[in-house]
């Protein structure tokens, strides 16, 4: 009985492997649920944000969307970090951090929590 059940399970697995793959890959017919009934893929961001224009010869086109934060100078090659002075591209990418208390830890208070607790009172 055990061998018969095992043979049936193995046969079912082979049938599933051989039949399921072609079913998922076939072209769908109208009114039929098949493997080709998937949502339409989204268009590329290049087609959505920028119209195609001819580039002059010798100018490389960019594949970045218009909303990208990378400037055109950042795409130029620069020396590895830590060697020599930072290039203009690296300097353009540096961000400034506002001074003052850390709002995540001190909740905007000018005092640190340790100073507020140690008032010297008994």
UniProtKB/Swiss-Prot annotation:
Where the protein is mainly located, per its record? secreted
Q: Which GO terms describe its biological process?
A: cell differentiation
Q: Where is this region: Disordered?
A: 28-122
Q: Where is the composition biased (Low complexity)?
A: 64-77
Q: Name one GO molecular function term.
A: receptor serine/threonine kinase binding
- Which InterPro entries does the UniProt entry name for this protein? CLV3/ESR
Compositional bias, Basic residues, is annotated for 54-63
* Family label: Belongs to the CLV3/ESR signal peptide family.
Q: What does this protein do?
A: Probable extracellular signal that regulates meristem maintenance. May function as a putative ligand for a receptor complex including FON1. Regulates the size of the floral meristem and the number of floral organs.
Q: What is this protein's name?
A: Protein FLORAL ORGAN NUMBER2
State the gene name recorded for this protein.
FON2
């Amino acid at each position: 009985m055990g061998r018969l059940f095992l043979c049936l399970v193995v046969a079912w697995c082979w049938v599933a492997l051989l039949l399921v793959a072609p079913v998922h890959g076939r072209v769908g017919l109208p009114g039929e649920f098949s493997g080709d009934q998937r949502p339409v893929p989204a268009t590329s961001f290049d087609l959505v944000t920028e119209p195609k224009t001819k580039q002059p010869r010798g100018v490389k086109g960019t594949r970045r969307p218009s909303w990208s934060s990378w400037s055109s100078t950042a795409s130029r090659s620069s020396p590895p970090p830590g060697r020599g002075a930072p290039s203009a591209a690296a300097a353009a990418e540096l961000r400034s951090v506002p001074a003052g208390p850390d709002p995540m830890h001190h909740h905007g208070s000018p005092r640190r929590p340790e100073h507020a607790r140690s008032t010297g009172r008994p």
